[in-house]
Amino acid sequence: MGFVKSMLALSLGLSAMGVMPAPACTRVMYKGLDSIVLTARSMDWKENIGTDLWIFPRGMRRNGEAGEHSLEWRSKYGSVIASAYNIATADGMNEKGLVANLLWLAESEFPVRDRMRPGLSISLWAQYVLDNFATVSEAVEALAQEPFALVSSYIPNMPDKFATLHLSLSDPTGDNAIFEYIGGRLVIHHDPSYRVMTNSPVFEQQLALNAYWSEIGGTTMLPGTNRAADRFVRASFYTQAIPVTDDVQLATAAIFSVIRNCSVPLGISTPGQPNISSTIWRVVANQRDRVYFFESVLSPNVFWVDLRDVDFSSDAPVCRLKLTGGQIYAGNAAADFEVSEPFVFEGV
């Protein structure tokens, strides 16, 4: 019993590090049989972030939106993404099955901008990866060279706060990588076993916390609060506990159940803990079959976009699936996208 109490104290101590105004997202990856790989995430935020889904074709010209000497590139791969405020890419999957998830990390400290490197606004961080890489290994090799200076900007409706985020990547082989800026330095965690990410504390400390709870065993006791460290432990346990199957329908249902278990009820508020934010949507990306599932907490059903039904050719238009008006979709919504001008990424 003394051991359990000590582990609980450690969990509460590390969880308390995350008490600050921030969203409480969770990301998990599942690897099943017959090459099934699924990545799920929740988006938790204190208000509606005006998310729409977008189709971006190959060949789009991009600008890093970081002022003078911004990074420029042309997209190599097409992608389906979920926007935030229609000024940033928060989540998405490209046509090669590479998935990018942006989550909050209050401990992020970005370096003073190096003017020798082209700048990249944080609103484009995930999109840059989706545009340019097919695998996690490719992205890790390229980003480790720090080809750009990442520049943060203010959050809509929070004019006194900069965006502090970390980035997770996964691909159809089951590989994973986490990118964080800690103390002004880029830290990359790259290993297929890194299947779970939440918010605070930094990823290295999350791994240590999870190792302690693994000694207890999830069938004995699991931390049950909405804090990031507790959600990390629960997501890790349940991702390992659900069936390893070759039935993609069962696997999808199972990983949805895990991400729902880590979600925060709509409308909940915790006095003194503004970081405990309600879950507003959830995503599951089937990377083997290139299917992007989306679930709004305000919608009666899950719908999906089958990327195999999307035209990503360089002469195809940008298309948008409007969600901000409370629209309801069912089944494969690939045909419901409408041609649209692309949104403008937030710059600095």
Regions found by a protein language model. Give the residues of each.
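Positively charged n-region of N-terminal signal peptides that target proteins for export
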Residues: 1-6
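C-terminus-biased signal that marks the final domain/tail of proteins
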Residues: 23-38, 62, 151-153, 157, ...
